[in-house]
Each structure stands twice: as C-alpha cells, then as structure tokens.
A protein has these predicted regions:
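Residue-level recognition of single "structural anchor" positions
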Residues: 1-335
Length: 335
C-alpha cells in the first residue's frame, strides 16, 4: 500500500508500519545521488583504488568504505538467497586459498567454485589457515546443493580432507531403532593435487584420490571439464583467484591499497564475487552467459543497479515446539 508518493514510502497491510522503497537494499538511508554510488561500486569491482575515487568524485573515503560494506552486505544476502538455496548441481567443486597481505597483518581467503558452470560458491576470510577456515568454506559449499555425488578437488592442505569427511556426512538409515549413524555417501569423492616446489618453481605434481575410485574420479573430471585429456587439477579455482586479485585492489600482491579492516576486505569480496556470478559474462561459457545463467539460477545478465536493489524475501519463521516466545508471536502476527 502506498503511503507517500513524494517520499516513496509504503505501508504494510498486516503490521501497519511504513517503510521506504530502499529498505533492505544497498541504497537504504543514502543521501547521495544513486548514479554516484553505482559508479563508485563499479569502479571498486574493477580494482580502482579508494583514493582515486575520492579525488575523482570529491567523496570522503569513509563514505566510500561505508558504501562498500553496505553493498557487500547486500551482495551477501543475494548470494545466500540465490546460490545457497540448494539448487546447484555440485558435480566437481574445486577449492583453494590465497594469502592476502593487509596493513599490519595477514588474512587468508578460501574460495570454492563449481567447475561445469564456473559458479563461485562463496569464500571465507580468516586470520589463520586452519580447519575453522576450511570448515566454514565447506559449510557454504554444502548449502549450495546436494553433495551425494560431489567431487571435491583441493590442494595439498590436509584440512580439506578431514573437514570434508566431517561436513559431508549424512545419516545412514538402516531401519533399526535409534539414531542413525553418520557417514559419507557412496557417491562422494575427494581428490588432492600436491605440488612440490624447488626455488619457487613447480618441479613435480602428484595427484591422489582420498575417497572414491580413481576411475570414477577421472570420469567425472572428463565429463565436467569437457576434455578427454583432462587430469585431476585445480586450474579453474586458481584462475578464479587470479580474477579476484585483478578485480579487488587489496588482493594485489604488491599494492599500496591494502585493507586495514576485516570488514573492508569482506565487503569487497562479496561485491566482486556477486559481480562475477551475475554481471560478468564468462568467455568459456559462450553466448554472453554468466555463471549464474549456466547454473540455471537466472535467465538474464544482471546490472549493477539490479544487484544492489534486489529485494531479498524474508526468511521463513522457524518451527517451534512448546510455548512460543514473545518475539516469535509478534513475528507471526506481523506475517
């Protein structure tokens, strides 16, 4: 229900409260022209340093940082609504991490992608390269789709195998009384690519199958990469990481625009990742298709304005056994 056309406000028919048109979007409570924020976000997604934007548009650097954080939050909501809805066919998933040099510290950025559609499944940032980082990444991978027939290809970091064996487990129902035992499905496969370096050069590449048969792993790799000469590799995720380094200024190896805060790096990560999935056409997919189009998540190529103004529907109310709390009763009345 329209409340005010001049102020672009609406009134909810159920709760009776008014809200603005830009509620729960990146433009909420923004007092600058919309074109300015769209231009700034486009430049940030193409690795433009913040100081250059400050000089070009006469905008305070704190304003640019706040816009990047809000746009990153919007992109994260869109990613969780579209990609992590459980509809992606996870045939071959490659995962890897990169070292990010920040101001006064170091961050680790772990990412994963689906090879067949080139879809970015998400990333996790942490100060330590440990099992918690890898576990958070694999939790996002599992939210993207079923893992009954997944092939996970990683580098030599042992945390991937241990965390995958823990997170990809499912209940094995036997028909007996009691809680079913947790275990991996018969279609789950895990492979590792271990590279040995000497004087900063790769001198040997070892390929190992952790879970599953080698014949099934090779067959899956050939089917997803569409090449009879394909071997177990992490080339696709490494190419994606190169895209992130080229499109996000703080990820450049020798940069003067290093990130000072975790939130700045995370906001830029979600912005670039969502642009990669929804805005940028991938050359290997052909016909001006984006990875989200190849995965069947959308039928057109998005624009920056559509990404930042997309209204994500609210989450469903949780099921509650017993007496419901006050906040849940108020939410049910409003819904």
């Amino acid at each position: 229900m329209i409340h005010s056309q001049k102020e672009r406000r609406y009134r909810c028919k159920r709760c009776g409260r008014t809200f603005t048109e830009t509620k729960d979007t990146a433009f909420y409570r923004m007092h600058k022209p919309r074109w300015l924020m769209l231009a700034v976000m486009t430049l940030l997604s193409y690795s433009c340093p913040v100081q250059a934007i400050v000089v070009a548009f006469d905008v305070d650097e704190r304003t640019v940082a706040r816009w990047q954080r809000e746009s990153g939050s919007q992109c994260r909501r869109v990613h969780e609504h579209l990609v992590e809805a459980g509809k992606v066919a996870l045939l071959q998933v490659q995962a890897d991490e990169i070292r990010v040099k920040a101001v006064g510290g170091v961050f680790w950025l772990a990412s994963a992608m689906e090879v067949r559609s080139r879809l970015w499944l998400g990333s996790v940032i942490s100060q330590h390269r440990d099992g918690r980082l890898i576990g958070g990444l694999l939790i996002r991978v599992r939210a993207c789709g079923p893992v009954e027939k997944i092939l996970l290809v990683t580098d030599g970091l042992s945390s991937y195998s241990s965390q995958a064996l823990k997170i990809f487990r499912e209940a094995l129902h036997t028909g007996k009384v009691g809680r079913p035992r947790l275990g991996l499905g018969t279609g789950v496969m895990i492979a590792r690519v271990i590279k040995r370096y000497q004087r900063r050069r790769v001198v040997e590449v070892m390929r190992r199958v952790v879970t599953g048969s080698e014949a099934e792993v090779i067959s899956r790799v050939i089917a997803t990469q569409r090449s009879m000469l394909a071997l177990i590799n992490t080339a696709y995720i490494e190419r994606l990481q190169a895209t992130f380094r080229a499109r996000l200024a703080p990820l450049v190896r020798r940069t003067r625009a290093g990130a000072h805060k975790h939130s700045t790096l995370e906001g830029g990560m979600w912005l670039v990742g969502s642009c990669y999935n929804l805005l940028w056409a991938h050359r290997s997919l052909g016909e001006e298709r984006t990875p989200a189009m190849a995965a069947g998540l959308t039928d057109h190529r998005w624009s920056m304005e559509e990404l930042l103004t997309f209204a994500v529907p609210p989450a469903e109310l949780p099921r509650w056994r017993g007496r419901k709390p006050k906040w849940l009763l108020e939410a049910e009345d409003a819904a």
